[in-house]
């Protein structure tokens, strides 16, 4: 067997795509493995195009996403705050959300445990080795179509059943992720009650509409190791989520940025983590179902030069067989539909066949009048 390339000697950033792909992807070391080798210069395949790189000059000073206390979640004041945030920001941070703080801590600990496994253990869940498509370990986003790789490792797990979870999810983190998903169910129902029933005046979320809104779950464990030349790359490029909405758990490392809505320039809002909080962001599916009233917003993760970071997004998605289209109640006053009906599975497939590219995915469903 040929020896593994010593990336610690890389000084000119010119390492070939094949060398990096072999080490990061095929051997399962991930970008964590690169970082741990003490590289001083970022390998060339991670260099983002100039127009995609992030600059501190793009940050809008003294601005922040809304912070909402969910303890009185069904009060008129809180309902209005949530709906206003979904319309005007697409992102908001919540406290007193009902998910036990000890559950969140166990999730973060389990995430660190998984990424602390040897490369050969993590690589058992790679695209080539995983016994099931619903569990996937990898790096970047879709490396085979990206012109520049993102500085991130991930484990993605799509929930189907408890039986499949017990059989195929990594034992080192599976119980904690299941606990997190179960503990979030009440919060999910409350958000749907506020955003859909109260906000969009949909009469009820019945057995037909519930799968259309929240029929599936995917949880990702993300790891962003410290990065040399962090200004040259990104942890995650600018994109909007395709979910109904996403519940994001993150640590205290400040790297998440959200595009300012209705801004004609290229300015972003820095998201400051609050201990014990969760971040909610509206996804493309709910933007479509609300006929554009609620907004899925571009966001990105910048690389950090001194600290490792984790995040755990829980994607609350429509069922794959669901049809995405505006609710009839939203169009009842004669409002023209902005989006054509599309299968959720087709929309998702479109998203995963291209690199992150801002808000372009939603154009897949847009009606061109």
Curated annotation (Swiss-Prot):
Fe cation binds at residues 239, 241, 299. Pathway: Phenylpropanoid metabolism. It catalyses: (E)-4-coumaroyl-CoA + 2-oxoglutarate + O2 = (E)-2,4-dihydroxycinnamoyl-CoA + succinate + CO2; (E)-feruloyl-CoA + 2-oxoglutarate + O2 = (E)-6-hydroxyferuloyl-CoA + succinate + CO2. 2-oxoglutarate binds at residues 224, 309, 311. The keyword Iron applies. It is an enzyme of class 1 (oxidoreductase). SUPFAM superfamilies: Clavaminate synthase-like. Binds 1 Fe(2+) ion per subunit. Its cofactor is L-ascorbate; Fe(2+). Gene3D superfamilies: B-lactam Antibiotic, Isopenicillin N Synthase, Chain. The keyword Metal-binding applies. Keywords: Dioxygenase, Iron, Metal-binding, Oxidoreductase. GO terms for molecular function: 2-oxoglutarate-dependent dioxygenase activity; 4-coumaroyl 2'-hydroxylase activity; metal ion binding. Residues 215-318 form the Fe2OG dioxygenase domain. InterPro entries: DIOX_N (IPR026992), IPNS-like_FE2OG_OXY (IPR044861), IPNS-like_sf (IPR027443), Oxoglu/Fe-dep_dioxygenase_dom (IPR005123). GO terms for biological process: coumarin biosynthetic process; phenylpropanoid biosynthetic process; response to UV-B. Its EC number is 1.14.11.61, 1.14.11.62. 2-oxoglutarate (OG)- and Fe(II)-dependent dioxygenase (2OGD) involved in scopoletin and umbelliferone biosynthesis. Converts feruloyl CoA into 6'-hydroxyferuloyl CoA, and p-coumaroyl CoA into 2,4-dihydroxycinnamoyl-CoA. Belongs to the iron/ascorbate-dependent oxidoreductase family. This is Bi-functional coumaroyl CoA and feruloyl CoA ortho-hydroxylase Diox2.
């Amino acid at each position: 067997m040929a020896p593994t390339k010593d990336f610690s000697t890389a000084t000119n950033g010119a390492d070939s795509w094949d060398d990096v792909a072999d080490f990061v992807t095929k051997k399962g070391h991930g970008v964590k493995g690169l970082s741990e080798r003490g590289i001083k210069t970022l390998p060339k395949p991670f260099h983002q195009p100039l127009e995609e790189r992030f600059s501190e000059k793009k940050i809008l000073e003294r601005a922040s996403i809304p912070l909402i206390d969910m303890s009185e979640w069904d009060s008129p004041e809180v309902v209005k705050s949530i709906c206003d945030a979904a319309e005007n920001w697409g992102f908001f941070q919540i406290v007193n959300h009902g998910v036990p703080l000890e559950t969140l801590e166990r999730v973060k600990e389990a995430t660190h445990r998984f990424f602390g496994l040897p490369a050969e253990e993590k690589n058992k869940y790679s695209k080539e080795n995983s016994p099931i498509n619903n569990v996937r370990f990898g790096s970047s986003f879709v490396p085979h179509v990206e012109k520049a790789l993102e500085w991130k490792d991930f484990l993605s797990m799509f929930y189907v059943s408890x039986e499949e979870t017990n059989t195929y999810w990594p034992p080192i983190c599976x119980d904690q992720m299941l606990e997190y998903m179960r503990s979030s169910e009440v919060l999910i129902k409350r958000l749907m009650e506020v955003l859909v029933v109260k906000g969009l005046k949909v009469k009820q979320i019945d057995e037909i509409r519930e799968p259309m809104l929240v029929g599936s779950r995917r949880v990702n464990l993300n790891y962003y190791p410290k990065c040399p030349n962090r200004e040259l790359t990104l942890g995650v490029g600018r994109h909007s989520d395709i979910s109904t909405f996403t519940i994001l758990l993150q640590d205290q490392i400040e790297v998440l940025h959200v595009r300012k809505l209705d801004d004609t320039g290229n300015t972003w809002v820095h998201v400051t983590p609050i201990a014990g909080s969760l971040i909610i962001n509206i996804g493309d599916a709910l933007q479509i179902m609300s006929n554009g009233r609620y907004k899925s917003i571009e966001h990105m993760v910048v690389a950090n030069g001194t600290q490792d970071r984790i995040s755990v997004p829980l994607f609350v998605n429509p069922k794959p067989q669901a049809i995405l289209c505006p609710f009839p109640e939203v169009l009842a006053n004669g409002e023209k539909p902005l989006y054509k009906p599309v299968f959720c599975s087709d929309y998702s497939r479109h998203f995963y066949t291209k690199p992150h590219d801002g808000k372009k995915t939603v154009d897949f469903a847009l009606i061109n009048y």
